[in-house]
Amino acid sequence: MPSFDIVSKVDMQEVDNAVNQAVKEIAQRYDFKGSKSEVTLEKDAIKVLTEDDFRLKAIIDILQSKFIKRGISAKALQYGKVENASGSMVRQVIDVQQGVSKEKGKEINNVIKETKLKVQSQIQDDQVRVTGKNIDDLQQVIQLLKGKDLGLDLQFVNFRQ
C-alpha cells in the first residue's frame, strides 16, 4: 500500500551557519557600531539581546535573510515575546521548530479528511503518515497541503509504493 510521511525538520547545521553569518554581518554594519548586540544559538533556540526595539527588528531582518539564503523556511522560526532585560536592553527568544506537534498533526488530519479522498492519516510522534491505495490520491494530498498555509515548513518523505 503506497504511503508517505509528512515531517517538519530543519538542518541545525544550516541554522548554525545562518546565525554565524548574521553575527558577522552585525559586527560589520555601521548602524551597529558601538552597540551591545548579541545573537546566540542554544540547542533549538536563538537568543537575541540588544539595546532597543529598532536594533532588535534589524537583527531579526538580518537573521531572516540569512535563513532564506541558506534554504531554511521562515516558517520554521517561532518568535517569543520581546522582554526587557537588565540595563535598558531588550531580549527575544526565537524557537526553531522541529517536528509536527500533536495539535498541528490533528489540523493536518482534518484537512486531509475534508478532501474525502480514499486515504488514511495517522499521527506518529513528530510526523504524520498518510496511506492510500491509489498513488494519485496521495499526490493530490501533497498538492493540497503545499497549497495550505499551516504555519509549518512541511516536507514529504519516505514515499513508498
From Swiss-Prot:
InterPro entries: DUF520 (IPR007551), UPF0234-like_C (IPR035571), UPF0234_N (IPR035570), YajQ-like_sf (IPR036183). The keyword Magnesium does not apply. Disulfide bonds: none annotated. One of its GO terms (cellular component) is cytosol. One of its GO terms (molecular function) is nucleotide binding. Keywords: Nucleotide-binding. It comes from the Bacteria. The keyword Oxidoreductase does not apply. Belongs to the YajQ family. Nucleotide-binding protein. This is Nucleotide-binding protein Geob_0921. It comes from Geotalea daltonii (strain DSM 22248 / JCM 15807 / FRC-32).
